[in-house]
Amino acid sequence: MKWWKAMYGDTLPSNTEGGSLRRMHGAARVMFTHRDGQSRLAELDQRTPMRVLFPKVPAGTPPVAAVTTVSGGLVGGDTQDIEVSVGDRAAATAIGQAAEKVYRSNGPDSNVEIALNVGEGAWLEWLPQETILFDGARLNRRTVATISPGGRLLAGECLVFGRLASGETMAHGKVRDAWEVRDPTGRLNWADTLL
């Protein structure tokens, strides 16, 4: 057993039998449009603990949005709503600033809803960093990509079950990671779920 678990294990925030925790509901919404021959930020809405950062990119390069959370990770009952949209003929990349962490839950799931919207002739890259699942984590994540004719999406997610280099494994918990690809009318073109 790690020394810190022996010393502080019973006082960690996820050990709350009989107590209640304040749950977070973070949100980030970003939209890019094509104007004057360039892709530009058109709308931005963010609710704590979610933030969207915009690293400087070389001229002529599509903009980059780094979606991050300042809370350090998700615990049971937390929710995140993320929406990234690129309008017709626009292009953008959305990344994660760092790995997302999902900590042990005392019961409820951590819920993440992601909407990726790609306009006609548009290009979106959705390339967040990995999601690290700690022992006892409970994650319910749903990603819905709505792609217009001629639109293209490059997307990927990576799940890491524990941190082996730190001697941590995910022996139990819950993961539900669902993906859907739809057209603008809402018609389902493809779906897959990892349980």
Ranges and model annotations:
Residues 2-111, 120, 170-195:
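Terminal catalytic/cofactor-binding subdomain
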Residues 12, 115-144:
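Well-ordered alpha/beta subsegment
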Residues 67-68, 74-75, 80, 132-133, ...:
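Long, contiguous hydrophobic alpha-helical segments, chiefly transmembrane helices and signal peptides
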Residues 83-85, 93-95, 115-117, 125, ...:
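Extracellular beta-strand solenoid repeats
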Residues 97-99, 129, 158:
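An acidic- and aromatic-residue-enriched active-site/binding cleft used to recognize and process polar
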Residues 131-133, 138-140, 153, 157-195:
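Short acidic-hydrophobic catalytic motif
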